Amino acid sequence: MRNQIADASPELVAPLARPAAVSPVVVPTERDLRLDLFRGLALWLIFLDHIPTNIVSWITIRNYGFSDATEIFIFISGYTAAFVYGRSMRERGFVVSSARILKRAWQIYVAHIFLFAIYMAEIAYVSSSFENPLFAEEMNALDFLKNPDVTIIQALLLKFKPANMDILPLYIVLLLLFPPILWLLLRNAVVALGASLLLYSLAWHLGWNIASYPTGHWWFNPFAWQLLFVFGAWCALGGAQRLSRVLASPVTLWVAIGYLVFALAVVMTWHFPRAAFLMPRWLSEWMYPIDKVNLDVLRFAHFLALAAVTVHFLPANWPGLKSRWLRPAILCGQHSLEIFCLGVFLAFAAHFVMVEVYGGVLMQVALSVAGILIMVGVAALLSWYKTVESRGGTPKRPSDADLAGGSA
């Protein structure tokens, strides 16, 4: 990409390389530790949810409302992407910042393929060594074991995805689409958010999605989930300030709490079917199914309610954000790509132990705690190495969206 830019004529590059004279958009400059904290917590929750029949997963938010940790992860990813690349686009222009975004998308793609190779090797080894093909079936890996040549090609095209490996392909596609979205956000944020909402609506009404292999479609429809990613970017580029009065209103707080209580009551009827009669029939017919694939409006609203309550009770300047007790989650959030990949590997390892060794409650708790401790240890090691590298005089590299935070 750099060579292409260098070889292009100055007349072609100059208008794109220089930031245009547009209305100023505030790009956050201060690090917001809440982003790292909640992204780290989301990674822990995703890990716990990825372990089948794990009793510890009852502490995750998916059991008490319509949304889950995925919404947190995607929103923060959009926020931090705008924080990093928004400033770059304003200072260095569209071409350079777009090249950085595409480079990051390529890095995540490489990480996804590497994780796929390790993950498939782990599943294949366990399935064959313990003569238990159910592992491969549960992890959606049977096609790989039967037709590895075809399946590998489909995996490279992001069409074949084993269980628990759907988030990174979504993130890759969102980053590939991000340069023009960011350009528009910096010039007219309302139009950009409106275009995102329009695409979301079209995806719902026209059934747009990307095909998967061997059948079906993407578990996270990028045409729908982009709305949450763009909304996060919009918040980072001044949207949060525009909503500050609304978020500070007691009415907003009580409406959000009321919706969270309503969602909790509905979800309890899923866990306790005998209470299902409490749900009016007309309400059930209107609500269901609450579609995760296409980011149902009820899921989006539930995330917004959670965010509104969180912002109200957890300000950016809360001293507790710098306490040692929250440091483990913050460290994991600052290295989200590596920790997510590690979590996928650890979740299957925990599932294997629970099936082949012992699956009691104590083992489930021990494996869950051990997995999180390993994730924290690796995040601390990565942070230490980054510190040593910077002290050693290594030239500072531009931040990427995994290591960034901005003020909300």
Predicted segments with their positions:
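Alpha-helical transmembrane segments and their immediate juxtamembrane cytosolic regions
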Residues: 2-408
